[in-house]
Amino acid sequence: MSTFVKVTDLITIMFFLAIAAVITASNTAELDVLEMARTAVVEAKTSFGSMAVTEATSEVAGSYYKLGLSECEKLYDESEARLSKLVVDHENFTVEDVRTWLSGVLANHHTCLDGLIQQRQGHKPLVHSNVTFVLHEALAFYKKSRGHMKKRLHGPARQGHGPTRPKHRPTRPNHGPGRSHHGPSRPNQNGGMLVSWNPTSSRADFVVARDGSATHRTINQALAAVSRMGKSRLNRVIIYIKAGVYNEKIEIDRHMKNIMLVGDGMDRTIVTNNRNVPDGSTTYGSATFGVSGDGFWARDITFENTAGPHKHQAVALRVSSDLSLFYRCSFKGYQDTLFTHSLRQFYRDCHIYGTIDFIFGDAAAVFQNCDIFVRRPMDHQGNMITAQGRDDPHTNSGISIQHSRIRAAPEFEAVKGRFKSYLGRPWKKYSRTVFLKTDIDELIDPRGWREWSGSYALSTLYYGEFMNTGAGAGTGRRVNWPGFHVLRGEEEASPFTVSRFIQGDSWIPITGVPFSAGV
């Protein structure tokens, strides 16, 4: 008996040693993959930085090209910061966190190249191909490895609340009794900080009013004050923007995490500008409001770009913020209104207006209970609601529109029959978009979807529709592309839900914003 026990113990020990060896090898492989990705990004950043320095003193290079190089530096700087965080703390991230951040790094890379092409400038092929290849391999590694890495990286699930919260994620603001307040108190942070905030009874860190009755007259002044707080600032900073039209170009950079903006309501608090591509911006740079700081929340604000349809690409809002959320906001523009650039995003009870590709980008974005208003384009144009930009089969990005409504904007209603309108078209090779239980107006063409150029991406894209309603929801005459799918059951639709697509049940509840975790 004792011999048997010893043999059994030996087998058990050998088994656990083998498991430990696999885990160690896995950790080493992960670190190697992330280090290679960071090295490639740093090399690209250095290369484009050198080019920017050279062009800054050149009398030949145009200012638009210099602008494109400057944006590339910024994008690679953001990517380097994310990859450095992953290298140091990769064991504290879930698999989906890592895949999301790698997907965001790849989106930054492609955005840099797209911007240079837009300015009719080339790029260094070696830099391009090296970064693309390394990030593709890193994404493939995590997609293939997530089975055996799942337990170690995800840890035990919290009962009924999804995965445990990794250290990098936005945390609950820490304003305990030790911090003295003057005036109204902050809302109950455990009861829905964003939803419960009230301008008459809740406290903001900064207040913006055009008439000078608050701490600042402009949003940019308030954000500058946030920057000056440095490391001493609160976990979440609340900025209340009173009713008014704020003609500003705003950029919330990667250092400004956990910013919460609250306005006085759609079409009452308005942030506006008119930058556009024909006048010299890149699509990325044309945004009236751009945000790269993670954990960004906004409520009761309109973001708009007034450049008009004749100015083509003109972004109202660009979002490159992980775990970002927009509640009761409006986004107004024509072409390229809402740039869901990268990372995980949630939109609830929002209004989106536009004509061509007006919800686009390479984020993992979910829209719930939103109203999508198709506007009148120029006479020779058609309308495409979405243009999702997934360019690698291993990224976890896409657009999911759920429990929403597609309608003609008031000025378009009477003439909508004169124009072709579609649910979307494939901006990139692996474009991925689904409409789930959404009410679709008859303005949508029976084909549903439109080609980008010939047969490009028709076999590699993923477009899906599930249980939609309305006169434009019939799938009998939809396109017969290999990549188009009529989803037959909830099991096919569930990968695109809040819970699974953006892991929202682990980070949305603290806001208090209502959401459906499933189909």
Curated annotation (Swiss-Prot):
It catalyses: [(1->4)-alpha-D-galacturonosyl methyl ester](n) + n H2O = [(1->4)-alpha-D-galacturonosyl](n) + n methanol + n H(+). Residues 186-196 have a biased composition (Polar residues). Acts in the modification of cell walls via demethylesterification of cell wall pectin. GO terms for biological process: cell wall modification; pectin catabolic process. It is found in: Secreted, Cell wall. Keywords: Aspartyl esterase, Cell wall, Cell wall biogenesis/degradation, Glycoprotein, Hydrolase, Secreted, Signal. This is Probable pectinesterase/pectinesterase inhibitor 36. PROSITE patterns: PECTINESTERASE_2 (PS00503). The lineage of its organism: Eukaryota, Viridiplantae, Streptophyta, Embryophyta, Tracheophyta. Residues 1-25 form the signal peptide. Gene3D superfamilies: Invertase/pectin methylesterase inhibitor family protein, Single-stranded right-handed beta-helix, Pectin lyase-like.
